[in-house]
Amino acid sequence: MDTIHIKISDYNYDLPDERIAKFPISQRDHSKLLVYKHGEVSDDVFFHLPDYLPKGAMMVFNNTKVIQARMHFRKETGALIEVFLMEPAAPTDYELMFQTSGHCSWLCMIGNLKKWKEGSLKRDFEIKGHQLTLSATMRRGNALSTEAAEMVAKGGGTNYWVDFDWDNEHVSFAEILEAVGELPIPPYLNRKTEESDKTTYQTVYSKIKGSVAAPTAGLHFTDAVLQDLDAHGIDREEVTLHVGAGTFKPVKSLEIEGHQMHTEYIVVHRRSLEKLIKHECQVIAVGTTSVRTIESLYYMGVHLIKHPEASEEDLHVKQWDPYELSADGNLVDDITPVQAIQAIVDYLDRNGLEALHSSTQIIIAPGYTYKIVKMLVTNFHQPQSTLLLLVSAFLHGDWKKVYDYALSHDFRFLSYGDSSLLIP
């Protein structure tokens, strides 16, 4: 299939507003579960998910945690400016960023930008009985170093460099966000964030701060379901992909060749890679973010086999890598998933590392050949979205059968909606 010339209009369906779940149901694991197995569709309740999985299988979860990335500042003129954290800039490491005190910098989207032409924004607040002032200063043009300008440019014109300063070196940036940040919820919910979202818009296994959107397939899991998976002998493993706001970016071009995928940052530990090898790279993925992480690993391993001297930055998977590497017949089809993952483990050994830190821009669309993911747990996605393309590629084009069934059987859609288990 000529993937780059896929027309996004071929992946459209009618989604009435009332089918978009504005809030989650009261018990996470009581959501509906659509089961697609070898072309047959049925439905059940999510807490029965373990009954459908092969005993001893490996299941991969994304353990990222959504941060309170939305901050509001009021100018002296009365104008309200929104600063939306997109990606850590200085330091660039997520873990270090949240530990910083006194100063840090982020790449941000700015709401009401036309009202913030110069100067710093300030906000007074209190933490543990201490009064603090947070200031935000935007740097542009000549105020940016060459490296900083390159980082800003990668955002495609929507990101701005913002320096944050606060007057208490005993307070971390994580505490700042907890005090003044607001949890971002998907724009299509068309409502303000509520206190309950702080709990319901996080997975029960979320650990690593960094996402601005939840890996929503995981929202249905409860401790009880996780224990049931263990009882069924499912080998649970976690990876980290920090979900960016680009996950909501609509495809505006007629063909997907014109759509630029966003970059997301991933961390995969040695133990997870060794488990992949043990399971012969046969995986049940929880959510599209886990899919993008795991499938990207294959191409990182291929790159290392071809270029053993490569750095972590060199391992970044570009949008069209899977298609271009396959098209030029450049060894890719001769490299097994196990060989590719072993190459990453060998790379970690050579460099004395316990985890791989890299990034991916991969687009998975019809014409893509899945290398590692064999079963997928996922929610129901927006029409004409890259996530729907990913599902279509997984089901070899049979996505309409799944979505027609969901629409005619009262399933709830999108982030707070119901779930599906897909077995091609």
Give short role names for the model-derived ranges:
Residues 1-424:
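Surface-exposed, charge/polar-rich loops and edge strands
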